[in-house]
């Protein structure tokens, strides 16, 4: 039986030389009469003279294949972690003007010609009109922001003003509509409550414009919501959280979460899930959960644990960890917008595809686009994970519109694909209030309207044929209906006319109430 040696360093069982080797007369004689080198393994073959000369090796066999190149590239990226977001091409795209091209080293004549062109451009009546229109639009936007700078609940004023406005498509901040009166607050609350109960009981909810959702949180009050949810959370149990490896831990009671928080196992950015939650969410994004867990003694224990960890790593205690710097909402929004622009510049510089083979580990988190987690996750200090291309394709089929970096971990992705062949909630992307849902809702409403309309018409025709004098009664009902509609239209026109007069005169309901009170006082004095 033959055996082969795959060891590149001579024989498997070669005896190591002694410290002082003795004189070998056989090898000395062989040095004067050299012989052919015998192989280091037993072989059964033909004699020497029957062996063919070895074929020359081609130069192309040393080149790795495409899969080996991908594997080598992936291993190199895991070891070096290249930063594709800060390259000269990306910085150039961010710094250059999106409209005008900057010419390098222009001559004096070109500079003067450009200045003359700009002067003639600004002197154009059309350009001046458009410039004035933009100034008026800016002033109107500023007035609308000032008109909505105070929420309905006075205790939420600081929180309301600390949150920055979202920039709109035209670059101007979009104002958040503040609730002005108690009637409007009640309408918001009950409008939300009716649709909420419909969804709670399994019925379809009425669609609302995505740009103007029902702001029931402002009507109730943000601080009141914190307190109400705090009372509810203190009475409930059964929480699951994601550890630093992405595994689900639970169920846990509040006291268990407090212990984990004090020991540094979880923090305010840890993803958590409760029995009545639709998705995993960070602890600080769940109403009332962070105050229930991070009480003063728990925060004191967590600070002591963090202090010890900093001392072990040689970090000064007063220096915050990377990504944990205290920042305002405005700073977080600015960093998130700049990060998004840089990501888009990376895609533009690489033909619409993110470069490299390895998916960054911070990009595997579901809420990676959240401004509160951007600085933490972009540091890429978490365990390296890799989603193969085949799994990405399966995820794209199962979850429409899903991107690879919107998955918490491989474990969650496989759970979503093979959760016993069933979903424990509606598949992502199926329930929306966008245009398709609104079109379907309108079709259903029109179908019901046609059914009841045709039914009422046919019932009326049947009664007219069978009941004598029914047509006379219907004529009288129709005349009364027309008179009632005419009275309502006239009353509504008067109300609109009064509202226009109040708007142009600058009068408010409070002024009218004060005048009515003064009239009542004067009448009482006369009496």
From Swiss-Prot:
Q: Which GO terms describe its cellular component?
A: chloroplast; chloroplast envelope; chloroplast inner membrane; plasma membrane; plastid
Provide the residue span(s) of the region labelled Disordered.
43-67, 491-527
Bias type Basic and acidic residues, positions: 491-508
Record-linked InterPro entries: GYF_2, TIC56
Q: Name one GO molecular function term.
A: protein transmembrane transporter activity
Which segments show compositional bias classed as Acidic residues? 509-521
Instruction: Tell me, in one coarse class, where this protein mainly resides.
Output: plastid
Deamidated asparagine: residues carrying this PTM: 350
Question: In a knockout, what does one observe?
Answer: Severe defects during embryogenesis, producing abnormal embryos and thereby leading to a lethality of young seedlings.
* Protein's UniProt keywords contain Transit peptide: yes
The protein's UniProt keywords, in alphabetical order, are: Chloroplast, Membrane, Plastid, Plastid inner membrane, Protein transport, Transit peptide, Transport
Q: Which top-rank group of organisms is this from?
A: Eukaryota
Residues of the transit peptide: 1-48
| One GO term of the biological process aspect | protein import into chloroplast stroma
Q: Where in the cell is it found?
A: Plastid, Chloroplast inner membrane
Q: What does this protein do?
A: Involved in protein precursor import into chloroplasts. May be part of an intermediate translocation complex acting as a protein-conducting channel at the inner envelope.
Q: How does it assemble?
A: Part of the Tic complex. Component of the 1-MD complex, composed of TIC20-I, TIC214, TIC100 and TIC56. Interacts with the translocating preproteins. Hydrolysis of ATP is essential for the formation of this complex. The 1-MD complex interacts with TIC21.
Name of this protein = Protein TIC 56, chloroplastic
């Amino acid at each position: 039986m033959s055996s082969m040696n795959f060891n590149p360093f001579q024989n498997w069982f070669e005896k190591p030389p002694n410290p002082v080797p003795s004189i070998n007369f056989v090898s000395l004689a062989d040095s004067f009469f050299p012989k052919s080198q015998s192989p280091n393994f037993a072989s059964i073959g033909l004699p020497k003279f029957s062996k063919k000369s070895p074929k020359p090796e081609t130069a192309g066999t040393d080149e790795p294949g495409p899969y080996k190149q991908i594997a080598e590239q992936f291993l190199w990226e895991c070891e070096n972690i290249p930063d594709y977001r800060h390259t000269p091409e990306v910085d150039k795209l961010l710094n250059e003007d999106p409209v005008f091209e900057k010419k390098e080293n222009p001559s004096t004549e070109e500079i003067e010609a450009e200045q003359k062109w700009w002067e003639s451009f600004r002197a154009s009546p059309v350009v001046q009109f458009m410039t004035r229109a933009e100034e008026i639009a800016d002033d109107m936007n500023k007035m609308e922001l000032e008109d909505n700078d105070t929420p309905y609940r006075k205790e939420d004023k600081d929180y309301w003003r600390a949150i920055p406005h979202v920039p709109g498509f035209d670059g101007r901040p979009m104002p958040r509509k503040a609730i002005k009166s108690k009637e409007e607050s009640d309408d918001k609350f009950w409008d939300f409550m009716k649709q909420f109960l419909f969804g709670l009981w399994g019925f379809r909810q009425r669609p609302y414009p995505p740009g103007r959702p029902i702001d029931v949180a402002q009507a109730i009050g943000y601080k009141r919501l914190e307190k109400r949810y705090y009372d509810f959370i203190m009475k409930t149990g059964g929480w699951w959280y994601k550890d630093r490896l992405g595994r689900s831990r639970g169920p846990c009671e509040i006291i268990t979460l407090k212990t984990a928080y004090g020991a540094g196992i979880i923090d305010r950015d840890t993803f958590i899930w409760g029995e009545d939650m639709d998705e995993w969410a960070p602890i600080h994004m769940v109403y009332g959960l962070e105050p229930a867990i991070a009480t003063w003694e728990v925060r004191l224990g967590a600070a002591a644990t963090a202090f010890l960890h900093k001392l072990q790593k040689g970090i000064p205690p007063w220096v915050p960890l990377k990504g944990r710097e205290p920042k305002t909402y405005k700073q977080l929004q600015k960093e998130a917008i700049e990060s998004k622009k840089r990501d888009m510049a990376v895609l533009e510089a690489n033909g619409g595809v993110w470069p490299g083979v390895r998916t960054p580990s911070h990009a595997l988190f579901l809420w990676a686009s959240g401004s509160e987690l951007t600085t933490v996750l972009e540091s890429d200090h978490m365990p390296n994970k890799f989603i193969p291309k085949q799994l990405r394709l399966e995820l794209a089929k199962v979850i429409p519109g899903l991107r690879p970096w919107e998955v918490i971990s491989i474990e969650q992705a496989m759970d979503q694909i093979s959760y016993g062949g069933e979903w424990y909630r509606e598949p992502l992307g199926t329930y929306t209030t966008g245009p398709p849902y609104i079109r379907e809702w309108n079709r259903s409403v029109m179908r019901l309207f046609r059914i009841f309309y045709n039914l009422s018409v046919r019932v009326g025709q049947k009664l007219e044929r069978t009941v004598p004098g029914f047509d006379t009664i219907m004529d009288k009902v129709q005349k009364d209906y027309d008179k009632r509609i005419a009275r309502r239209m006239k009353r509504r026109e008067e109300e609109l006319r009064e509202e226009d007069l109040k708007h142009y005169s600058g009068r408010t309901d409070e002024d009218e109430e004060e005048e009515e009170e003064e009239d009542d006082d004067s009448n009482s004095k006369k009496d």
